Amino acid sequence: MAIVPKRKTSKQRKHKRNTHSALDAQNLVTCKNCTSMIEQHVTCYRCGFYKGKKVAGYTCLNDRVQ
């Protein structure tokens, strides 16, 4: 036999349980090289710079388009 709940889960209990399931907003910053919006601690997808230095072996969006 399958496991069956003893009683119905109320809306309030269900909502309380799901309060931590919401997604957080992304923390965006501006790239210091090209001023586009990027995520923190990530190489810029437009210019390929991270912390003011060009990342080796990274093909940026501008190189792919041309």
UniProtKB/Swiss-Prot annotation:
Residues 1-21 are annotated as: Disordered. It comes from the Bacteria. GO terms for biological process: translation. The keyword Ribosomal protein applies. The keyword Translocase does not apply. InterPro entries: Ribosomal_bL32, Ribosomal_bL32_bact, Ribosomal_zn-bd. One of its GO terms (cellular component) is large ribosomal subunit. Keywords: Ribonucleoprotein, Ribosomal protein. Residues 1-19 have a biased composition (Basic residues). It holds the Pfam family Ribosomal_L32p. Signal peptide: none annotated. GO terms for molecular function: structural constituent of ribosome. Belongs to the bacterial ribosomal protein bL32 family. HAMAP family: Ribosomal_bL32 (MF_00340). This is Large ribosomal subunit protein bL32. The lineage of its organism: Bacteria, Bacillati, Mycoplasmatota, Mycoplasmoidales, Metamycoplasmataceae. The gene is rpmF.
